[in-house]
Amino acid sequence: MRGQRSLLLGPARLCLRLLLLLGYRRRCPPLLRGLVQRWRYGKVCLRSLLYNSFGGSDTAVDAAFEPVYWLVDNVIRWFGVVFVVLVIVLTGSIVAIAYLCVLPLILRTYSVPRLCWHFFYSHWNLILIVFHYYQAITTPPGYPPQGRNDIATVSICKKCIYPKPARTHHCSICNRCVLKMDHHCPWLNNCVGHYNHRYFFSFCFFMTLGCVYCSYGSWDLFREAYAAIETYHQTPPPTFSFRERITHKSLVYLWFLCSSVALALGALTMWHAVLISRGETSIERHINKKERRRLQAKGRVFRNPYNYGCLDNWKVFLGVDTGRHWLTRVLLPSSHLPHGNGMSWDPPPWVTAHSASVMAV
């Protein structure tokens, strides 16, 4: 890239120097001499207004694309409302099909114990999906307090010009700094941070379970409905009523939607589960990856200062303190607060052990 740029800039600079030299000569036409002089004046004015010795080509590109960034951020902000409505409509359509189409069919074929199991599991799963999605949307992710000087800060935010605690990052869409920011989720129309990260992951997890349950449970009904739809164009045409045709198409829609969401959302859930097991957020993964490469080039090993071990990472993330909390705080709806305030973090055991060994020496 640099070689191509130098090949293009070399002839351009040579032509410009020739024009400047011609401008000094008296034989040069007055028109050309005036153009060269205006070029110099314009260059001086531009540099006096915009020149910065600390800036470079990257700064100029960022400044040029700032209107584009602003447009994208505002479009995503408004599209977040559309995505939230879309999630509610799609989820509501699946629930309506389950009650209006699936339930009348299984009432005639399933046994009473099997019906009871499906009844309790499906409603338990639905309650957890609705609860965690509502909490993820309405719960603020957490913002660093402004005007306080007693918080431990790592740096100053270049956008907010406020102290930025550890694991805090600026969201260009919300235009605020977010504590332990993971990402901005358009499907929530909200940032995923310290106080709603658990709700986001729990929604993804239980929504994946619900989609897998619907896809697997409706497999036989889907096959029958799909085979019936294939016979619509036969001669003579089958004698299906309007209600039966709607039921067939609804079952096919249910199976394809739940299967596709189970695959896509399941992959996202597994990815976030891996990050949680490592004690990282989505942003910290990229930061730690660069830091790991930098230290590896120096022959050193990078260790995540927020990794407490796989099990302890999950306990901190889910807010679990006792064995009973796995039932009351994970498998049942719970609005308990996460561990910590999102601004200061306890050091992991390996950091404490290293500090103790240094003090002993």
From Swiss-Prot:
Q: Name one GO biological process term.
A: heart development
Q: What is its membrane topology? A: Multi-pass membrane protein
What subcellular compartments does it reside in? Endoplasmic reticulum membrane
Q: Does the keyword Endoplasmic reticulum apply?
A: yes
Question: Can you name a GO cellular component term?
Answer: endoplasmic reticulum membrane
Q: Which UniProt keywords apply?
A: Acyltransferase, Apoptosis, DNA damage, Endoplasmic reticulum, Membrane, Transferase, Transmembrane, Transmembrane helix
- What is an example of a GO molecular function annotated in this UniProt entry? palmitoyltransferase activity
State the protein's name: Palmitoyltransferase ZDHHC16
